[in-house]
């Protein structure tokens, strides 16, 4: 993170992006577990792609309706993989997960939009501000909502926390948001659900967790098909914009 080479207005906006995409998002996300089972939370996260494409279009002051079609196919693929019986008393939890989805989608879209708008490419100099915003929100949430008397992690739990903070979150979010700036917004939206089969494969290979392979293959195929469809949709819009 650098100070002199970064536009102060951009730095402040990236702080706000981090505060929303990680900070506020995780408040909604973890709170939802008080109302939903794990598989229900996982199921309701599949709607994030809709938020990504709609919010990015809103920031760009445009509306590419066909993007919703390819994104819907990706959502269907994720639904095939993750569908399970739903608890009848899930409305509060559902809304909390959608709040998390909205924050995560807004963060990705805003980050991509801001870097395009400012023409800033040296993301390593900027991304620290993302975590400044995220840390500010999570620190306040921990003070207000946390119970530090119960925080007594074992060595293995501490190691997991360090890994989650340095690798999964720090490196992971940097690479994800950097990638978001390299691809079309529809591809970014679809890839949010491509994480689902990837996570299941990791659990299957490394931790031998049970998985419905038929659903995994069918859902993954639909997500792949959504990418093929989206590539054709991108070409359609490119040709139309050239004519205009």
Model-based region annotation:
Residues 10-16, 63-74, 94, 121-129:
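Cytoplasmic-side transmembrane-helix entry/capping segments in multi-pass membrane proteins
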Residues 1-8, 21, 54, 74-89, ...:
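Membrane-interface helix-cap regions at the ends of transmembrane helices
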Residues 18-23, 27, 49-54, 105, ...:
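Hydrophobic/small/kink-forming positions within alpha-helical transmembrane segments
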Residues 2-39, 80, 166-183:
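Specific transmembrane alpha-helical segments of multi-pass solute transporters/efflux pumps
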Residues 1, 52-53, 86-146, 244:
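Transmembrane alpha-helical segments that form core, pore/gating elements
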Residues 1, 29, 48-69, 197-216:
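C-terminal transmembrane-helix exit sites in multi-pass transporters
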Residues 26, 40-47, 111-135, 169-205:
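Helix-helix packing/entry segments at the starts of transmembrane helices
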Residues 63-83, 193-194, 213-234:
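Hydrophobic transmembrane alpha-helices of multi-pass small-molecule transport proteins
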């Amino acid at each position: 993170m650098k100070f002199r080479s970064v536009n102060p207005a951009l730095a402040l906006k990236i702080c706000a992006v981090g505060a929303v995409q990680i900070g506020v998002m995780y408040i909604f996300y973890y709170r939802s577990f008080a109302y939903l089972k794990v598989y229900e939370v996982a199921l309701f996260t599949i709607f994030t792609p809709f938020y990504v494409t709609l919010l990015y279009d809103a920031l760009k002051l445009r509306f590419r309706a066909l993007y919703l079609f390819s994104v819907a196919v990706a959502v269907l693929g994720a639904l095939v993989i993750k569908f399970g019986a739903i608890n009848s008393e899930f409305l509060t939890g559902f809304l909390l997960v959608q709040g998390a989805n909205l924050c995560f989608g807004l963060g990705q879209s805003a980050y991509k939009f801001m870097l395009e708008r400012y023409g800033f490419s040296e993301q390593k100099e900027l991304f620290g501000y993302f975590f400044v915003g995220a840390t500010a929100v999570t620190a306040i949430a921990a003070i207000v909502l946390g119970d530090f008397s119960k925080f007594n992690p074992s060595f293995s739990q501490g190691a997991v926390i360090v890994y989650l903070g340095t690798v999964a979150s720090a490196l992971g979010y940097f690479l994800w948001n950097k990638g978001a700036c390299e691809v079309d917004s529809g591809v970014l939206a679809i890839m949010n659900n491509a994480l689902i089969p990837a996570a299941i494969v990791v659990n299957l290979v490394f931790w031998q967790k049970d998985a419905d392979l038929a659903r995994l293959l069918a859902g993954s195929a639909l997500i792949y098909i959504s990418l093929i469809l989206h590539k054709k949709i991108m070409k359609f819009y490119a040709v139309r914009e050239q004519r205009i």
